[in-house]
A protein has these predicted regions:
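Domain-level signal for soluble alpha/beta catalytic cores
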Residues: 1-231
Length: 231
């Protein structure tokens, strides 16, 4: 929901959105209704595990955030709260057996990206207060920052560490990945940590710059590491 809101209310889009809505609040009310109706529909069809891909937080942590949103730091903090509120408004009163996860992405088009930045500036909003069961997080390079922000992950929420990049065919060093998992475990208990690729291998029509064989080698590595770390 936050990414939908972002795309229709960022400076380049807001004027056009307000041609159809009297206010942003009216737009947000419709947005919540739409998402709730969709979730109800797919739940009735059998969905019990819902993942929300959310690039909005990636733009907020980027050093160019004030430029993207045409605001200052106080304005960015207000936007973080707004995005948290819209997500949680959608994620209230859901069926107890529906698992909701979120993937925070910084862009994954043809082995390029849209944003950079550690999670620190959004952690107290996203990790502490968003009503999801698990976070799928990119941690495949220095653009993602360190693991310190994971200390904000509240309750028994799970964290899926995206330590295996999908942007390059180069295979990661197994022992280095295992070491990073144990580093993350300083902030979130190991039994609440998981491992995955950083994002999709073909998030868009134009796939990333690696071969199918390299893709499968990376997935095999994920499996091997998971078996070694968690048994």
């Amino acid at each position: 929901p936050a990414q939908f809101l972002e795309q229709f209310t960022m400076p380049f889009a807001l004027e056009n959105t307000l041609k159809y809505y009297a206010s942003v609040e009216d737009f947000k009310a419709d947005l919540v209704k739409m998402y709730k109706a969709f979730i109800e529909e797919i739940y009735a069809a059998g969905c019990r595990n819902l993942q929300l891909d959310d690039c909005s937080w990636g733009l907020l942590v980027d050093p160019r955030g004030p430029e993207f949103f045409n605001t200052d730091q106080a304005g960015l903090d207000a936007i973080k709260q707004e995005y948290l509120d819209i997500n949680n408004a959608v994620l209230t009163d859901l069926p107890e057996d529906l698992i909701v996860n979120t993937h925070v992405c910084r862009g994954n088009f043809h082995s390029t990206y849209a944003a950079s930045g550690a999670y620190d500036d959004v952690a107290s909003f996203l990790f502490e207060k968003e009503n999801v069961h698990a976070y799928f997080l990119e941690f495949d390079d220095s653009r993602s920052g360190g693991f310190e922000s994971l200390k904000y992950v509240s309750g028994d929420k799970k964290v899926v560490l995206g330590l295996i990049t999908t942007k390059s065919g180069e295979l990661e060093d197994k022992e280095a990945v295992i070491a990073r998992i144990h580093e993350a475990a300083k902030y979130v208990l190991l039994d609440r940590l998981y491992l995955s690729p950083q994002c999709g291998f073909a998030s868009c029509e134009i796939e990333n710059k690696l071969t199918e064989e390299q893709q499968w080698a990376k997935l095999k590595l994920v499996k091997e590491i998971a078996e070694e770390v968690w048994g």
